[in-house]
Amino acid sequence: MVHVIKGVIEAEQGAIEYYSRIIEETDGIDPVTQDMVIAILRDEQGHKRLFEGFLREYEKEGLA
């Protein structure tokens, strides 16, 4: 299970980096797309924090 959680965290980090690049590239060019991607980025950051919490719980319980 820990392997899956770490994989999700890694995938979320990749998505965060990808969306951050889109935000930079659309700055001053396409505010509608930028606003949409900012909202998506917030979701991805929340997902990452959630799974980091799951990982901490597994580690605390000695399941990691």
What residue spans do the PLM features occupy?
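Iron-associated oxidoreductase/ferritin-like identity signal
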Residues: 1-64
